[in-house]
Each structure stands twice: as structure tokens, then as C-alpha cells.
UniProtKB/Swiss-Prot annotation:
<dbReference type="Pfam" id="PF02033">
    <property type="entry name" value="RBFA"/>
</dbReference>
<keyword id="KW-0963">Cytoplasm</keyword>
<dbReference type="InterPro" id="IPR020053">
    <property type="entry name" value="Ribosome-bd_factorA_CS"/>
</dbReference>
<keyword id="KW-0690">Ribosome biogenesis</keyword>
<comment type="function">
    <text>One of several proteins that assist in the late maturation steps of the functional core of the 30S ribosomal subunit. Associates with free 30S ribosomal subunits (but not with 30S subunits that are part of 70S ribosomes or polysomes). Required for efficient processing of 16S rRNA. May interact with the 5'-terminal helix region of 16S rRNA.</text>
</comment>
<protein>
    <recommendedName>
        <fullName>Ribosome-binding factor A</fullName>
    </recommendedName>
</protein>
<dbReference type="GO" id="GO:0005829">
    <property type="term" value="C:cytosol"/>
</dbReference>
<dbReference type="GO" id="GO:0030490">
    <property type="term" value="P:maturation of SSU-rRNA"/>
</dbReference>
<dbReference type="InterPro" id="IPR023799">
    <property type="entry name" value="RbfA_dom_sf"/>
</dbReference>
<dbReference type="InterPro" id="IPR015946">
    <property type="entry name" value="KH_dom-like_a/b"/>
</dbReference>
<dbReference type="GO" id="GO:0043024">
    <property type="term" value="F:ribosomal small subunit binding"/>
</dbReference>
<dbReference type="InterPro" id="IPR000238">
    <property type="entry name" value="RbfA"/>
</dbReference>
<comment type="similarity">
    <text>Belongs to the RbfA family.</text>
</comment>
<comment type="subunit">
    <text>Monomer. Binds 30S ribosomal subunits, but not 50S ribosomal subunits or 70S ribosomes.</text>
</comment>
Length: 116
């Protein structure tokens, strides 16, 4: 059975993911940032840091998006502060979600094996 605090952190991670996804699609006017898709969020045990894993369809611009969206992390933190029932809103760090690239790599390897 999961420890109660783990369940609470997972619930906060889900809420943070929803809030940031909604903000990107509805509140952000920057076309570059709008291309980002939030895949998942990890929240530190003390709830002080939220790592937000994003990706985009065009892999060539992910570095530009990360630079720009990390520059706007204060905007997203303000949204969290207004919507989360926490004493202090977590600092937000946006990171590239490389899991999709790894899945594609595994699938291509499986196709190569299947072709032999």
C-alpha cells in the first residue's frame, strides 16, 4: 500500500500538470510556448520543486521552447500559487521529456530484429 504522503504528492503532480497544460493552451500568447505538451510532473517530497516534462512535435525547436518557457516559469508559479492549497508554491523547472524518443528508438530496434 502506498504511503499517504505519496498519494498526496501524486495528486498535487496531477493538479500541477492540469494547471500548466491549461495555462499553456489558454493563457499563453507566445506561439513557440503553445507548441509544448506537458507529459508529466514530478514534485519533490517537500513540495518545493516541480519538474515539468514537456515535448513538442518539432524536435528541432525544443531547446528554444525550453529556454523561453523556463524564462516564464514565474508566470506559471503564480498560477500554481493561486490554485494550490500550499503554503508556498513550488519552483518550476521545465525539462525535455526524452521518453518518447526512447520509445521510438526501442520500436525501431524491434522492427530491425523482426526484419531479420
Amino acid at each position: 500500500m502506498k504511503h499517504m504522503s505519496n498519494v498526496k504528492i501524486e495528486r498535487y503532480e496531477s493538479i500541477i500538470k492540469d494547471l500548466i497544460s491549461h495555462a499553456i493552451t489558454t493563457l499563453v500568447y507566445d506561439d513557440l510556448i503553445k507548441q509544448a505538451t506537458v507529459h508529466y510532473v514530478t514534485l519533490s517530497k517537500d513540495k518545493s520543486i516541480a519538474k515539468v516534462y514537456i515535448s513538442c512535435y518539432d524536435k528541432t525547436i525544443i531547446d528554444k521552447i525550453l529556454k523561453k518557457i523556463n524564462g516564464a516559469s514565474g508566470f506559471f508559479r503564480t498560477i500554481l500559487a493561486k490554485n494550490l492549497n500550499l503554503r508556498k508554491a513550488p519552483a518550476i523547472v521545465f525539462l525535455n521529456d526524452e521518453s518518447i524518443d526512447k520509445i521510438d528508438e526501442i520500436n525501431s530496434l524491434l522492427e530491425q530484429i523482426k526484419g531479420k
